Amino acid sequence: REKNTFRRGGPSRRGDDFRRTEPLRQTEAESTGSGVAGRNAVLELLNSGRSVDKIYIQTGAREGSVTVIVAEAAKRGVPAVDADRRKLDMLCGGVAHQGVAALASEVEYVGLADILRIAEERGEAPFIVVADSINDPHNLGALIRSACCAGAHGIVIPKRRAVQVTPAVIKSSAGAVEHIAVARVSNLAAAIDELKEKNVWIYAVEADGEPYYDKDFSTGGCAFVLGSEGEGVSRLLRDKADFIVAIPMYGGVGSLNVSAAASVVIFEAARQRHK
């Protein structure tokens, strides 16, 4: 592995926890993880191949984009039934549902090895996004959508001290979570070490790094680490990164939110990778 000057962290550690597959766990108010809220999210769910038990349509809302959802449900043999707003609110656990919700089989997290296998099956160098302790469901949902649209092979999130893939995240991703692999790991540092063992370059996106557009993302695998809204990338993951990259700011505001920052950097990586 040779490249320009880089930061290297401590010794690699290997763990088996990111090879497990396990169902998403959510609160009872979120219908034990099987409630999906919002028109785009439900439509993407129907197109994903995941098992769908039933679609609920708010009474009187069968018009506009809802007719497309009902037609798609009919093609898949999924019943679409009317329900009052109270039932929808209860099913969705307070998430805005736009008059449409679904009951589906639980989404499953994949392992880190599965994401690497996806890249291998596509004949591509790994392209991964690592979410370091992001707590806002809207930011995580938007980050997942950006990663999916940029062609990333998967996104990695921690099991603790971070938002999980809840109905709010699914809705904020506009259903993109149905089309990208999400790995949940016990130890992000160990996951980073595993990626480095697989010759994946680690880029931490921070305010004080080198301009991202000066980097070559086209040679070899790459993983982009994005930190939480208030704290940024943790010291441990920053120290393990090969490169620290930044988005130069030219206006009166000093930063972008995490999903916007991710979009800027990972779409540049996608551009370079598809030259």
Spans of model-derived segments:
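N-terminal positively charged helical leader segments and presequences
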Residues: 1-118
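Structured adenosyl-cofactor binding patch, chiefly the S-adenosyl-L-methionine
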Residues: 43, 48-49, 149, 170-176, ...
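RNA substrate-binding interface of SAM-dependent RNA methyltransferases
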Residues: 47-50, 120-210, 214
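Short, acidic/turn-prone active-site loops that include or flank metal/cofactor-
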Residues: 60-62, 86, 160-162, 229-231, ...
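Short, glycine/polar-rich helix-capping loops at beta-to-alpha or helix-loop-helix junctions
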Residues: 66, 162-168, 231-240
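Active-site/ligand-binding-proximal alpha/beta "capping" segment
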Residues: 203-257
